[in-house]
């Protein structure tokens, strides 16, 4: 059976949202805004939010900071997963992962296909776990 198992009680979690971009600011971070709105609408808490430059060391530093925070349960990022030279978000996240959730990227691309067609092939979406944070 597909979908959400209604027999399992809902547990709200604290989520940090990272936008990876050299050009976005708080005033025009539409992707980050959308993530934050959907997280809140789903009943979770946006615990922290940051715009991080397309620089692997900066991404890793912020990610490690959030993973070390005892109240942050998950990190969701947007940006930097394409195939251009500046797209290094997956490499930064892989540097930090203790375990990769290998099926996440496949599921993400499958769901994205319905919206953007074959352009989904350009996404290198990834998921993993580090320090008990997803």
Located regions from the model:
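Non-catalytic beta/alpha edge segments that cap or flank active sites
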Residues: 1-134
